[in-house]
Amino acid sequence: MIPSLDICFRLMDTYEMPENIRRHSMMVERIASLITRRLRKAGLGLSPEKVTAGALMHDIAKSLCLKTGEVHSVKGRDICLQNHLDEIADIVAEHVVLNNHRPEGQLTEKEIVYYADKRVNHDIVVSLEDRLRYLLERYAKEVAHLEAAIMRNFQVCKELERSIFSKLDFKPEDLAGVLRREGY
């Protein structure tokens, strides 16, 4: 099932999601919802409910995994499946590394949430380049093999950005302004 907003927020409480991760998830949801609404106007058949729930739940396991060392996207998928949220489990599972992305393919809810997550640093809208710099500084500084993985991941994200914005009436650098103007 696709969880309602109420269920998403109750699960955030149940899994003790810290306030800073909630703010991040809510900003990811705003971006993903704006992009989804605009893509639907352009004729794409995306589910706004699935995008909203997937964006809100994408980091459901982050604080747990900081303690246990587990991979938060995998643990998050497991949490979704345990709570019968199978329709968003793949979104949560692939919000860090997108599997089977085809640049020429139809855009999916999973790709929209993945992209939106890469545009938010903490709870602030940033460019992909700024987010990349932050991730390299935070995660790759001490673990050399992570730099190549992060760079590959962001190459996919740049392709995805081109695909998304080729269908929209504004540019990636205008995202924060469009969010403000439209009251997101």
Predicted regions and their residues:
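Acidic/His-rich, divalent-metal-binding segments that scaffold phosphate/diphosphate chemistry
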Residues: 1-68, 124
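Active-site helical microenvironments for divalent-metal-assisted chemistry
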Residues: 7, 132-135, 148, 152
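Alpha-helical structural elements of signaling/regulatory helical domains
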Residues: 17-20, 84, 145
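Charged catalytic carboxylate motif
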Residues: 27, 31, 75, 111, ...
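Charged phosphate-binding loop/patch that engages nucleotide di/tri-phosphates or the phosphate backbone
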Residues: 146-184
